[in-house]
Amino acid sequence: MDAFDVIKTPIVSEKTMKLIEEENRLVFYVERKATKADVRAAIKELFDAEVADINTSITPKGKKKAYITLKDEYNAGEVAASLGIY
């Protein structure tokens, strides 16, 4: 699966801004069929960042969210800034 097909869009809200600042986490809508391994590979390819942990959930509307915790060497704020959301 192509990295651009896996990662659909970042989620920007007060909650996600708090996660970026305090927990070094990013939140994206991802392709519903994408596995955690697909998401990990897409983050590595698109942002050159190593992933420490991924949690996923499917919303009642059927969209899949990925909560991505980056390793300590990487800053979620810098990745968010490169996306233009922070």
Curated annotation (Swiss-Prot):
Position of the signal peptide: none
GO cellular component: ribonucleoprotein complex; ribosome
Cross-referenced InterPro entries: Nucleotide-bd_a/b_plait_sf, Ribosomal_uL23, Ribosomal_uL23-like, Ribosomal_uL23/eL15/eS24_sf, Ribosomal_uL23_CS
Superkingdom, natural source: Archaea
SUPFAM superfamilies, A to Z: Ribosomal proteins S24e, L23 and L15e
GO biological process: translation
Molecular function terms, GO-annotated: rRNA binding; structural constituent of ribosome
Family of this protein: Belongs to the universal ribosomal protein uL23 family.
Purpose: Binds to 23S rRNA. One of the proteins that surrounds the polypeptide exit tunnel on the outside of the ribosome.
Name this protein carries in UniProt: Large ribosomal subunit protein uL23
Gene behind the chain: rpl23
